[in-house]
Amino acid sequence: MTEIRRLRILITNDDGIKAKGISLLISLLREADFADLYIVAPLEEQSGRSMAFSLVEPTTLEPFDYPQRVQEAWAVTGTPVDCVKLAIGELFKENALDLILSGINNGKNSGRCLYYSATVGAIREANLHGIPAIALSQSENIAFFQEAHMASLIRSLCEFTVAYKHTDPLGLNVNFPASTDDSPWKGIRFTLSGNEFLFGIPRLVRTEGNRRYYTLYDMRDKVSEEFSEEYLALANNYISAAPLVSKNTPRATLSEEELAFLKDSFEQSVLWKASLNLEEDLA
């Protein structure tokens, strides 16, 4: 019998190496037990940094004593893109990575918010280096994350993303819905990224002489008159999975035929493997 090779997976995020979301992801990956895990993540929160990286000031890299068992863990005084660059170009340049995961983010990264997201920025960087990658984000708050069945789903997402063959490596943007009434998630939907986005309302915090201090953290949803597939999936308690190589994304490299093939492949592979209660229509 041929032994199945374990994947080499890098995990990063933008909430910081001590965040709850990355710990949840490590737990699920360890439960699924199909990969060797390597963490390279920011020491501090880097939300909203998109694909920013340390161009002028040097960044530091040091071993981190992670509380869960992984192959290696490193903390970076920089952005998620810094983490990916250091992982690929320095730490693992002699032993290639199979996949990069970013998350689980505390808050959704759907619609056009993916332009701002440092969670998504990390997987874009991975794709630029020819490595498939998945961004994972929990709507509203990480406390809404439902762990039941997620180890098998995460594994099937990882294996599908690595196995998918195209001119460009696959990048998936996965968002988990916030079920405020604690009802179980209905399943997972392959969607396209929507046009919805969050925008910050400038709020004056204080003034010191002529200097004013503002925050843009007061975020509001802006939606189109016609809701996107992604928006409807999340609103109806489905997990959404949107490719980052389709329309409404910075790298629209898939033709309509290729996109249809990707969707069919996803539904035959990931949806079939995941132990979830799938329904036919969005309610």
Swiss-Prot record:
GO terms for molecular function: 3'-nucleotidase activity; 5'-nucleotidase activity; exopolyphosphatase activity; metal ion binding; nucleotide binding. The keyword Lyase does not apply. A divalent metal cation binds at residues 14-15, 47, 105. GO terms for cellular component: cytoplasm. Its cofactor is a divalent metal cation. The keyword Metal-binding applies. Its EC number is 3.1.3.5. It is found in: Cytoplasm. Binds 1 divalent metal cation per subunit. It comes from the Bacteria. Transmembrane segments: none annotated. Keywords: Cytoplasm, Hydrolase, Metal-binding, Nucleotide-binding. It catalyses: a ribonucleoside 5'-phosphate + H2O = a ribonucleoside + phosphate. It holds the Pfam family SurE. Gene3D superfamilies: Survival protein SurE-like phosphatase/nucleotidase (3.40.1210.10). It is an enzyme of class 3 (hydrolase). Nucleotidase that shows phosphatase activity on nucleoside 5'-monophosphates. Belongs to the SurE nucleotidase family. HAMAP family: SurE. This is 5'-nucleotidase SurE. The gene is surE.
